[in-house]
Amino acid sequence: MCSSDLRDRVAIIGMGCTKFGERWDASASDLMVEAAYEAFSDAGIEGKDVQAAWLGTVGSFRTGQPLAEALKLDYIPISRVENACATATDAFRNACYAVAAGIYDIVLALAVEKLKDSRFSGFAI
């Protein structure tokens, strides 16, 4: 599938983003809810309209369960994606391909990290 085919089959209907910075008061789940509900509002949909989701997060040994719990997305497939610095892009790409293939109409691609809470400041170079 070339990029022009993808452009004709997939549309971004909403987006949400949390404030970047030190968010000591918010958990990763809080950030997921904040971004997702902003995206739902922007798209004019509700969480129940989402048919599948992709969660991008690095270093978490859990599956898509945190996203399902935080957003009450019961009984839909949620795939956790991890691809180092390209994790969010990979989650987005997989969600786009699922829509382009005609498997789903409305999907959610979401990525979250809370590096400061884990006391990890990055890799030394």
Named regions from a protein language model:
Residues N83-E113:
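Active-site-proximal alpha-helical scaffold in enzymes
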Residues S4-S79, Y97-A101, V112-I125:
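Conserved "HGTGT" condensation-loop signature of ketosynthase/thiolase-family condensing enzymes
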